[in-house]
Amino acid sequence: VTSADVTLPDTAMFDQTGAERRMASEIVGDRIVVIDFIFTSCTTICPVTTALMAQADKRLSDVSADDLALVSVSIDPNTDTPARLTEFAARAKADWTFLTGQKRIMDDALVAMDAYSTNPEDHAPMIIIGDASTGNYVRVFGLPDPAMIETRVRHLLEMRSKADGGHSHHH
């Protein structure tokens, strides 16, 4: 786990319903976020990563959606249409936002998050966990352990409530 300087992109992308959404402002806002990177034709590691994300999501089911967002970002946007993302999410029983978009926009977004690889097949599993309201992010390399994701998210929630009675807003 390495602490990371992450700037979430706010370019227009599409979620799995085909709706145009901006990642930083519309999806994440000032919530705590867990981001992973997938592509739908990936048969090896992505279904595993997504299943682990789903387990983490279950463990955090008591946390309000106002406080927590899970996001899966496509690293193969030319192939990953919203319809394919919907299918991929359904197979994985993943109940969160999947994002794709124009290749150039997605590539820039991935570069911004340090998650770009020229060949999706080669991408090493990596997730980003952080609090968008404080900019406190970590990168986790390798397959994410659901318990670790849960611990990290709860730690961020705790830091928020310490910060000021449960509402952390930047002034």
Identify the meaning behind each predicted range.
Residues 9, 95-96, 107, 113-127:
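Structural micro-motif
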Residues 6-8, 28-32, 65-68, 80, ...:
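Extracytoplasmic
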Residues 38, 46, 57-64, 110-113, ...:
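Sec/Tat-exported extracytoplasmic proteins
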Residues 122-171:
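Thiol-/selenol-based redox modules, centered on thioredoxin-like
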Residues 48-94, 103-112:
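Structural microenvironment flanking redox-active thiols in thiol-disulfide oxidoreductases
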Residues 14, 97-101:
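Short acidic-hydrophobic, aromatic-tinged amphipathic segments that line or gate anion-handling sites
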Residues 23-53:
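Short active-site neighborhood of thiol/selenol oxidoreductases, capturing the structured segment around
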Residues 1-25, 51:
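N-terminal "domain-start" segment that seeds a small globular fold
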